[in-house]
From Swiss-Prot:
GO cellular component terms, A-Z: plasma membrane
Name of this chain's protein: Lipoprotein-releasing system ATP-binding protein LolD
Species of origin: Gluconobacter oxydans (strain 621H)
UniProt main location, coarse: membrane
Membrane topology listed for this record: Peripheral membrane protein
Family annotation (CDD domains): ABC_MJ0796_LolCDE_FtsE
Compartment list: Cell inner membrane
Gene encoding the protein: lolD
A biological process term (GO) from this entry: protein localization to outer membrane
Matches recorded under InterPro entries: AAA+_ATPase, ABC_transporter-like_ATP-bd, ABC_transpr_LolD-like, MacB-like_ATP-bd, P-loop_NTPase
Binding-site positions, ATP: 47-54
Broadest EC class assigned to this enzyme: translocase
Pfam families noted in UniProt: ABC_tran
PROSITE patterns, A to Z: ABC_TRANSPORTER_2, LOLD
Assigned protein family: Belongs to the ABC transporter superfamily. Lipoprotein translocase (TC 3.A.1.125) family.
């Protein structure tokens, strides 16, 4: 476990509340949650299924709007921003890793990792160099030109992790990023993920059920009664 970063704020949640309607009932998944993640800090989110981990990550990544409270990305409040600006923040500052890869089937592994860079205006040459480097770090140098349908489930997930890191995001949000990998592969891939995040000075909030993986991060939080608390 590393010393907690004292860098600038990468993500801050203030009074974050999320309610859903279920028939005649209103379910409050998050209830005034408070949290701060600083640049260079990697935090594990460990909590049972159904407690709101995925909802929290969607709110933090500006994929959903809270019922109340505010999300700050790099000290910029997201409330009141247009959809266009929120999309630009997600594209330029945030990387997402989901448990299921969501790769584009008509593009090769290398092209899938290049694509977010090209959308952000990176030259094709630099985008390809970055994609080849990241895929190589995750053991996929021999799979650069393979379509997702020709990759194993583990290879698809590693490609998705490389894609999430492609634009050197300042904030990485990951939901069980190695949950579909075997134990040996998960250990290697997670170690490489941590190395890339630390080398590039990013901040990361990573949901995991794996206590051993959580112990390799700077600190661990959990969800209790709709609030984020130390684990």
């Amino acid at each position: 476990m590393n010393e907690v970063s004292t860098g600038a704020s990468a993500l801050r949640l203030e009074g974050l509340t999320r309610r859903f309607r279920s028939g005649e009932e209103t379910l409050e998944i998050l209830s005034g949650a408070e949290f701060e993640l600083r640049a260079g800090e990697i935090v594990a989110l460990v909590a049972p299924s159904g407690t709101g981990k995925s909802t929290l990550l969607h709110l933090a990544g500006l994929l959903e709007a809270p019922s109340a409270g505010t999300v700050f990305v790099a000290d910029r409040p997201a409330s009141g921003l247009s959809d266009t600006v929120r999309t630009a923040i997600r594209r330029d500052q945030i990387g997402f890793v989901y448990q299921f890869h969501h790769l584009l089937g008509e593009f090769t592994a290398c092209e899938n990792v290049m694509l977010p860079q090209l959308i952000a205006g990176v030259s094709p040459r630099k985008a390809r160099e970055r994609a080849r480097d990241l895929l190589g770090r995750f053991g996929l140098s021999h799979r650069l030109d393979s379509l997702p349908g020709r990759l194993s489930g583990g290879e698809q997930q590693r490609t998705a992790i490389a894609r999430a890191l492609a634009n050197q995001p300042k904030l990485l949000l990951a939901d069980e990023p190695t949950g579909n990998l075997d134990i040996g592969t998960a250990d290697h891939v997670f170690g490489e993920l941590l190395r890339v995040v630390r080398e590039e000075g990013a901040a990361a909030l990573i949901a995991t059920h794996n206590d051993e993986l959580a112990s390799r991060m700077d600190r661990t939080v959990t969800l209790r009664d709709g609030k984020l608390v130390p684990f």
